[in-house]
Amino acid sequence: MKKKINAVRRSIMKSLTKNIGKSHAEGKLNQNFVVKRVLISRPNHRLGNILLLTPLVQEIEKTFPNAKIDLFVKGGITPIIFKNYKSVDKIFQLPKKPFSNLFQYIKGWFSLKSNKYDLAINATQGSSSGRLSISFAKADYKFFGEDVEDLKIQHSDYNHIAKNTIYNLRNYLSQIGLEDHRSQVPFLDLRLDKEELEDGKKKLHDLVKNDKKTICLFTNATGDKCYSESWWTAFYDKLESAFPDYNIIELLPVENISKLNFNIPNFYSKDVREMGGFIANCAIFIAADNGVMHLASASGTPTIGLFSVTNETMYKPYNHKSLSINTNNVDNDKVIELIKSSLN
């Protein structure tokens, strides 16, 4: 029932906002115009979607080094993710359940009118509420995130959800007179500090009690993205045989469940940054497509994303040595080969 209600809600929002917002490059920036305040809108509460904002924030930091960035989001995870981003100023947080917190929800939307921005950015072209929020905001320049057909030809990774908006934004900014730089799109980055990394190292050592490198598994995911217990058991058996010199452990989800029935050493935490510090000390992280897969990528660890139902082109991890594997097309032996290539 909840899924049906959400589907209806999205359909209504899409219809109401389909004609809202077109990015216009209304003349060139004059020489005295300085971008000091930027709004980025992503009204979503999911861990993965908020982590996928980190490359865009880094892009703004690089393009406008002295700008302050406000974020318009949903739920309470965003301040935790952006804890070490000094450029991030205000975070407007819509409640996850609007009808249970109607006053806070309305207040969140009206906060957009109480601030003036040089540039307002819709972080995801497909977000109806994102387009609506940018339309509602007070800004000199509004970027709604529309796709640019020519860019699809220029960039093989154009459809990746973290990269798409950056490519489109670079194109838009070049139209209003800013230099179009072609540097690599930033990686996801949790910006773990020294203490968090040291704490993660200690917790990992306390678990494995040796100095061998560690392979970390995350066996949970939502809905059809989740692989079965039998799949994980068969995969683990091959992994153990192929990597005898590695520790193999499991990071448990918030629900404290395991597709391996808790048969291997495991680590549990509800603290996203603690999890990130722990993962950062592992040699490689293997998971199906989910928010914790993006957390691993944002922690800097080579990440193997297992895909069977979702679009890997849009969601695959892309930091150093990370890769996605469509398990519909390869067997476990091939998966092991790809893991070896990443580790080497």
Predicted features and spans:
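Donor-binding and catalytic core of enzymes assembling or modifying cell-surface/extracellular glycoconjugates
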Residues: 227-304, 308-309
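Nucleotide-sugar donor-binding patch of glycosyltransferase catalytic domains
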Residues: 144, 266, 294-344
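Active-site donor-nucleotide binding/catalytic segment of nucleotide-sugar enzymes
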Residues: 37, 41-43, 187, 191-257, ...
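Conserved nucleotide-diphosphate donor binding/catalytic pocket of glycan-assembly enzymes
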Residues: 2-3, 92-189, 211-214, 218, ...
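Conserved nucleotide-sugar phosphate-binding/catalytic loop shared by glycosyltransferases and other
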Residues: 71-102, 325
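Histidine-anchored nucleotide/phosphate-binding helix
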Residues: 49-64, 236
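Leloir-type glycosyltransferase catalytic cores
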Residues: 4-21, 155-203, 319-344
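Nucleotide-activated donor-dependent transferases that construct or modify glycoconjugates
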Residues: 23-46, 217
